[in-house]
Design a protein with these regions (language model features):
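N-terminal secretory signal peptides that target proteins for export/translocation
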Residues: 1-14
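Mature, soluble, non-transmembrane domains
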Residues: 110-225
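N-terminal signal peptide c-region/cleavage motif recognized by signal peptidases
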Residues: 29-31
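Early extracytoplasmic/domain-onset interaction patches
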Residues: 37-69
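Structured domain cores in non-transmembrane regions
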Residues: 66-144
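A short catalytic or substrate-binding loop motif that flags glycine-/basic-rich loops and adjacent residues
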Residues: 36-38, 213-214
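Sec-dependent N-terminal signal peptides
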Residues: 20-27
């Protein structure tokens, strides 16, 4: 994957470059195609520590059919999907680079931004249809009290990658104290003028630090009594 052709440091860009996928992807779809270019279906689990604090998020990111097809190209035997072991180098490449982009996960409590540690429990799996899912646990740098509302969003600021929560069971709670609940605030639809901006030229001219993806990001809120 690549946010922009001029930004090869993106974690998914490295995967595409290593597997020579970018050329094939854009030859098939046309380089002028508007953002996004990659779609990810998200399921997240808010993980609580034994003391009742929120300790992290466990993500499952299911990639779209086109990315999955390129990711597993040349892997697997006898028509079977590749194993976790075969996909492990690809998982390692992706996750090692995610820190630079804050793991595409932005959490807050009381208006303060929360930081994460390096991901653990990393696996990459391909199902019987060769759809690829990246799973990992993202621990908070410091666990936080569940008695104050905790929120998070999963999105790509440059909107090269579209992250969308699954319709069914998008967010669950693990080991949560009694009475905890989870809700979601959906983003407002883009107005007509904003939709017209979604050209490749618009995104290539982004200034450093620009954040378009937040406009389309669902905010998940966890509240406990």
């Amino acid at each position: 994957m690549t946010f922009r052709f001029r930004q090869p440091s993106h974690p998914f860009t490295r995967v595409f470059l290593l597997r020579a996928l970018t050329l094939a992807l854009f030859a098939a779809s046309g380089a002028a195609r508007a953002h996004p270019h990659v779609w990810v279906a998200v399921r997240s689990e808010v993980v609580f520590a034994p003391d009742g604090k929120i300790m992290g998020l466990r993500h499952a990111w299911e990639f779209d059919e086109m990315y999955s097809a390129f990711a597993v190209q040349g892997l697997g035997k006898d028509g079977k999907p590749p194993t976790r072991e075969e996909l492990a180098p690809l998982a390692k490449t992706n996750v090692e680079s995610l820190a630079e982009f804050e793991f595409f996960t932005f959490a807050k409590q009381g208006g303060a931004k929360l930081k994460f540690l390096e991901p653990t429990e990393v696996t990459l799996e391909a199902d019987e249809k060769n759809i690829v899912t990246l799973r990992f646990l993202l621990p908070l740098q410091t666990p936080v009290s569940a008695q104050k509302p905790f929120s998070f969003q999963v999105y790509d600021p440059t909107y090269f990658v579209s992250f969308n929560f699954e319709k069914q069971n998008p967010v669950t709670l693990a080991r949560a104290p009694d009475g905890c609940s989870v809700s979601a605030v959906e983003p407002k639809p883009l107005v007509a003028d904003e939709n017209k901006k979604l050209s490749e030229a618009f995104f290539q001219n982004f200034s450093p630090g620009a954040d378009f993806g937040i406009k389309l990001a669902t905010r998940v809120i966890v509240a406990c009594p």
